[in-house]
């Protein structure tokens, strides 16, 4: 029986301190070494800062909310999600702005506060800050309004002056591969100078982007990728002035390894005097996973990995921590707040869903007027895929008050496939709904797999519902998702056709739940999620 909130309130300190260990991927080998990726999930454009023995990471979230995930580690290998810095981004938008929003954030610790800067390619440069990264962050401040500015990184100099470097999005302003620097006010809230072009990648280092700004040994350093997400390399640039001129050097590239395009990331100097670099690798439908590389400064340049090529297995950074912990995946929905691993496909509205006193998460069927497919549905409850191979199982109850209300388990990207139950007349159909080119407006196809009698029904006259209790399962391997169901949670039957997963716009495919109402005259149906488990 599910615990009630009264009991949960007493247990919150225990729940908060519980540390999740994944069943499908852990980078810590338990012998003082780690194996990349250290985060085998889609944390695109990661950046990191260190405060004492604590490391904090954030990444791009684009239009998914809550945004700007905050992860914590004590050793750069074992990470857990501790919060989000952005709760709302487009409050006036109902349709998701796929691929827009938060691009390539930068997290810094300055004068007792944590700052995150990011570029929204359509709106400008934004900043949020807090004194407690596990708590509430301030409302976003627009530092510079305008289009095209992306991949921002601040630097507070020794004299207290603040500078900002950023890249530019060709899709918004007509050019890219250049980096510009300007001065901000000392508090970092507004620009006080115009931009100066400090680097042009041209033909040699085309698609230069994602800069991070540092200072070391009297040099101003910019570390950034070039050459594109899937096949690029990592540059380091240095100058005696923040405005250049900068000399550059390639410090990390694929070389003879299988690690394609070691891309954007952040450098960190630990309290033990070690240097490390976190970056992402693009894995297609699985998104942009996070790798950790040692950094060697002996040549005066930050040569990453082993002689400039990525390492796969290596010794762990020095640390007093021996705890193994991973980003959260499974969820029993026993807490009065939604788990930190979940995001909505757009800005959250309360009528999408909420926790309940019965220890289930309740989604309300979303009234979807567009009949072609689910691409523009903001109310999907999704999380990142946690490994190349995994099994996701959900225990669900659908209370359908009218025909055409359905809910179930989905793999979502530019194309999608879902296993759902839909009310048809006085019974339920098990269906596989698939759309391979949802982003192009392709019409969804529907395959009826089974028909069930309701497991329960309301004994009232006013808008009575019929109920379906079911376990839905998705097996993922090799970029394909296959489905199964069970009525007792023990014996599962494979159904439907394997689905070739597709990535989203700038993000990997996501797994989760969907609840839809195509009957606009009825009360909303209810999809109660008892639990969701990754194995």
Segments (PLM) and residue ranges:
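Bacterial Sec-dependent N-terminal signal peptides
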Residues: 1-20
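Carbohydrate-active catalytic/glycan-binding domains of CAZyme proteins
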Residues: 19-535
């Amino acid at each position: 029986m599910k615990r009630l909130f009264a009991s949960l309130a007493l247990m919150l300190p225990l729940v908060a301190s519980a540390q999740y260990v994944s069943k499908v991927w852990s980078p810590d080998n338990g012998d003082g070494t780690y194996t990349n990726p250290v985060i085998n999930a889609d944390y695109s454009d990661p950046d990191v800062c260190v405060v004492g023995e604590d490391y904090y990471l954030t990444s791009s979230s684009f239009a998914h909310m809550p945004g700007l995930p905050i992860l914590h580690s004590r050793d750069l290998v074992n990470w857990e999600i501790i919060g989000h810095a952005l709760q709302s981004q487009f409050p006036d938008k109902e349709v998701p702005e796929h691929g827009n929003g938060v691009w390539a954030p930068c997290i810094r610790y300055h004068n007792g506060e944590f700052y995150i800067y990011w570029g929204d390619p359509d709106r400008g440069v934004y900043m949020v800050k807090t004194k407690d990264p596990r708590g509430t962050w301030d409302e976003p401040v627009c530092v510079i309004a305008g289009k095209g500015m992306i991949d921002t990184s601040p630097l507070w100099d020794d004299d207290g002056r603040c500078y900002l470097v950023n890249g530019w999005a060709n899709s918004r302003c007509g050019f890219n591969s250049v980096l510009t620097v300007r001065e901000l006010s000392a508090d970092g809230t507004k620009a006080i100078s115009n931009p100066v072009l400090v680097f042009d990648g041209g033909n040699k280092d085309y698609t230069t982007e994602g800069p991070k700004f540092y200072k070391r040994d009297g040099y101003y350093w910019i570390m950034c990728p070039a050459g594109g997400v899937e096949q690029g390399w990592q540059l380091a640039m240095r100058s005696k002035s923040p405005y250049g001129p900068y000399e550059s050097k390639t410090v990390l590239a694929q070389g003879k390894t299988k690690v394609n395009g070691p891309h954007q990331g952040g450098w960190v100097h630990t309290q033990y005097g070690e240097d490390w670099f976190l970056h992402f690798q693009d894995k297609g439908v699985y998104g942009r996973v996070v790798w950790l590389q040692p950094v060697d400064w002996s040549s005066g340049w930050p040569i990453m990995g082993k002689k400039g090529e990525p390492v796969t297995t290596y010794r762990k950074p020095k640390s007093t921590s021996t705890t193994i912990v991973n980003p959260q995946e499974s969820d029993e929905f026993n807490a009065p707040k939604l788990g930190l691993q979940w995001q909505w496909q757009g800005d959250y509205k309360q009528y999408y869903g909420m926790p309940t006193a019965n220890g289930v998460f309740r989604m309300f069927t979303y009234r979807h007027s567009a009949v072609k497919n689910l691409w523009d549905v903001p109310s999907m409850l999704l999380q990142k895929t946690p490994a190349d191979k995994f099994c996701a199982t959900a225990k669900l109850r659908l209370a359908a008050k009218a025909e055409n209300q359905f809910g179930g388990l989905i793999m979502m990207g530019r194309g999608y496939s879902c296993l759902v139950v839909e009310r048809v007349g006085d019974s339920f159909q098990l269906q596989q709904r698939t759309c391979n080119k949802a982003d192009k407006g392709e019409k969804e196809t529907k395959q009826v797999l089974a028909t069930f009698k309701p497991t329960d029904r309301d004994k009232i006259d006013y808008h009575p519902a019929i109920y379906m209790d079911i376990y839905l399962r998705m097996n993922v391997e090799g970029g394909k998702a296959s489905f199964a169901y069970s009525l007792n949670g023990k014996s599962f039957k494979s159904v439907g056709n394997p689905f070739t997963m597709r990535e989203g716009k700038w993000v990997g495919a996501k797994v989760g739940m969907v609840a839809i109402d195509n009957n606009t005259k009825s009360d909303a149906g209810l999809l109660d999620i008892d639990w969701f488990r990754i194995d």
